[in-house]
């Protein structure tokens, strides 16, 4: 694999300093030779040393020696720009290699930026290069290292970013591009353009589909890396692109395509919310899917799981049975339903025992203790018997009155 390219000439000047007296060579010439002839009869200067025959024969040799002796000490080269610790933890740092033009601005959240990206491992092995990578700033379309560092750049700037794996591909790594697990990365980023994002209301049907699909694919990538917060954010952005008000007419086919895409995003959003234990939000997402597609197996299954996580076994079991009826061979639904039936039986047993305890365990009458008479009967039984007797008398009176 290729390693990092050398910095460009402007970057080298920024890091090492520009050379002094760039026009020095124009001092050589005929006039210098004439000056040398005029000085030939003078004794050598002790503090400068006598030139050799070869040096004296070169045109302008004494002039060059004189200028070298009288030339002021060169100014020290400016130190390279310090690294900026973006988050203050040393895990994400940025250094400007080539500054942006004077007056250039920084991009804002929500703008679409285009960058030239070169990505390498810490050992210098280049793993990816994207000459025209475009993404919406702040939408989590790319790794966090880019989303957090690009807002600190000016348009036209080139910067080096070093990032811990936490802000790149994490413990899972990546297949494409291939990134090993827990790999820190070096990014060379050039911010080329920054433009306002699209007006969702003015998007055509196909443009909405394309935008929503991009956000959904970003969510899928985050989900596969077990970054469920970012996955949920991407799915939510996809749904927003689909459901926002439209000022452009769409065909029936486009509306149907958007509806199918919305269902996919809601299902994936519910899966992410389940992973985050956000049960109420997951329940809302599943319910929205079932409003459009009452027989959607994924939504039925996830809704049943959400209710089960909340302890609502009586509601969860019929929903899972409905899902199993739609797909009888699904082993996952079979296993989940069997588990819930057992949990429901255990829950009922616990509830029965609790009710008996609250009512004084009526299934077993207390044994008579020696030395105790009728007063040993609990007061609640006496009160209950009295109430029943009074009720019977009242009922008899009513019947007699009617007759």
Curated annotation (Swiss-Prot):
GO molecular function per UniProt: calmodulin binding; disordered domain specific binding; identical protein binding; peptidyl-prolyl cis-trans isomerase activity; protein folding chaperone
GO biological process terms held by the UniProt record: apoptotic process; BMP signaling pathway; camera-type eye development; cell fate specification; dorsal/ventral neural tube patterning; dorsal/ventral pattern formation; multicellular organism growth; negative regulation of apoptotic process
Free-text description of this protein's post-translational modifications in UniProt: Ubiquitinated by PRKN during mitophagy, leading to its degradation and enhancement of mitophagy. Deubiquitinated by USP30.
TPR repeat start and end residues: 212-245, 263-296, 297-330
Cofactor: Ca(2+)
Gene3D superfamilies: 3.10.50.40, Tetratricopeptide repeat domain
Topology term for the membrane: Single-pass membrane protein
Entries under Pfam families matching the protein: FKBP_C (PF00254), TPR_16 (PF13432)
Compartmental location: Mitochondrion membrane
Compositionally biased region (Acidic residues): 28-39
Reactions catalysed according to its record: [protein]-peptidylproline (omega=180) = [protein]-peptidylproline (omega=0)
Location (main, coarse): mitochondrion
Glycyl lysine isopeptide (Lys-Gly) (interchain with G-Cter in ubiquitin) crosslink location in chain: 240, 262, 264, 275, 298, 305, 325, 331, 339, 342-343
Modified residues (Phosphoserine): 287
GO CC terms: cytosol; endomembrane system; endoplasmic reticulum membrane; membrane; mitochondrial envelope; mitochondrial membrane; protein-containing complex
Keyword Repeat tagged: yes
Region (Disordered): 26-54
The protein's Enzyme Commission number: 5.2.1.8
TM ranges: 381-401
UniProt domain PPIase FKBP-type: residue ranges: 110-195
Keywords (A to Z) from UniProt: Apoptosis, Calcium, Isomerase, Isopeptide bond, Membrane, Mitochondrion, Phosphoprotein, Repeat, Rotamase, TPR repeat, Transmembrane, Transmembrane helix, Ubl conjugation
Superkingdom in the source lineage: Eukaryota
Subunit structure, as described in the record: Homomultimers or heteromultimers (Potential). Forms heterodimer with calmodulin. When activated by calmodulin and calcium, interacts with the BH4 domain of BCL2 and weakly with BCLX isoform Bcl-X(L). Does not bind and inhibit calcineurin. Interacts with ZFYVE27; may negatively regulate ZFYVE27 phosphorylation.
Entry function: Constitutively inactive PPiase, which becomes active when bound to calmodulin and calcium. Seems to act as a chaperone for BCL2, targets it to the mitochondria and modulates its phosphorylation state. The BCL2/FKBP8/calmodulin/calcium complex probably interferes with the binding of BCL2 to its targets. The active form of FKBP8 may therefore play a role in the regulation of apoptosis.
Extra remark beyond the main annotation: Binds the immunosuppressant FK506 only in its calmodulin/calcium activated form.
Name this protein carries in UniProt: Peptidyl-prolyl cis-trans isomerase FKBP8
Organism: Rattus norvegicus (Rat)
């Amino acid at each position: 694999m290729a390693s990092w390219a050398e910095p460009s000439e402007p970057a080298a000047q920024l890091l090492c300093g520009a050379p002094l007296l760039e026009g020095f060579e124009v001092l050589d010439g005929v006039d210098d030779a004439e000056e040398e002839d005029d000085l030939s009869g003078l004794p050598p200067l002790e503090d400068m040393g006598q030139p050799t025959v070869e040096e004296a024969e070169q045109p302008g040799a004494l002039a060059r020696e004189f200028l070298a002796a009288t030339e002021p000490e060169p100014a020290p080269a400016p130190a390279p720009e310090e690294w900026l610790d973006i988050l203050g933890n040393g895990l994400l740092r940025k250094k400007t290699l080539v500054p942006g033009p004077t007056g250039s601005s920084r991009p804002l959240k929500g703008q679409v930026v285009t960058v030239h990206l070169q990505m390498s491992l810490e050992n210098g092995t280049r793993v990816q290069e994207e000459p025209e990578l475009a993404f919406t700033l702040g939408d989590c379309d790319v790794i966090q290292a880019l989303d957090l560092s690009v807002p600190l750049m000016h348009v036209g700037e080139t910067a080096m970013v070093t990032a811990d794996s936490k802000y790149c591909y994490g413990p899972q790594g990546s297949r494409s591009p291939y990134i090993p697990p827990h790999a820190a990365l070096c990014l060379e980023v050039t911010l080329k353009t920054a433009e306002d994002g699209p007006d969702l209301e003015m998007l055509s049907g196909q443009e909405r589909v394309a935008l929503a699909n991009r956000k959904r694919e970003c969510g899928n990538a985050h989900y596969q890396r077990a970054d469920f917060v970012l996955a949920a954010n991407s799915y939510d952005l996809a749904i927003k692109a689909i459901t926002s008000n439209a000022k452009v007419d769409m065909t029936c086919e486009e509306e149907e395509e958007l509806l199918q895409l919305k269902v996919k995003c809601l299902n994936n959003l519910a899966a992410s919310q389940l992973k985050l234990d956000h049960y109420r939000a997951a329940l809302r997402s599943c319910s929205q899917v079932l409003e459009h597609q009452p027989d959607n197996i994924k939504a039925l299954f996830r809704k049943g799981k959400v209710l089960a996580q909340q302890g609502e076994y009586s509601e969860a079991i019929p929903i899972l049975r409905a899902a199993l009826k739609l797909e009888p061979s699904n082993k996952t639904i079979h296993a989940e339903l069997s588990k819930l039936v057992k949990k429901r039986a255990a829950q009922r047993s616990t509830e029965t025992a609790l009710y008996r305890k609250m009512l004084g365990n009526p299934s077993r009458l207390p044994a008579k203790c020696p030395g105790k008479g009728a007063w040993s009967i609990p007061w609640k039984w006496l009160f209950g018997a009295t109430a029943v007797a009074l009720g019977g008398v009242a009922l008899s009176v009513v019947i007699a009155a009617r007759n």
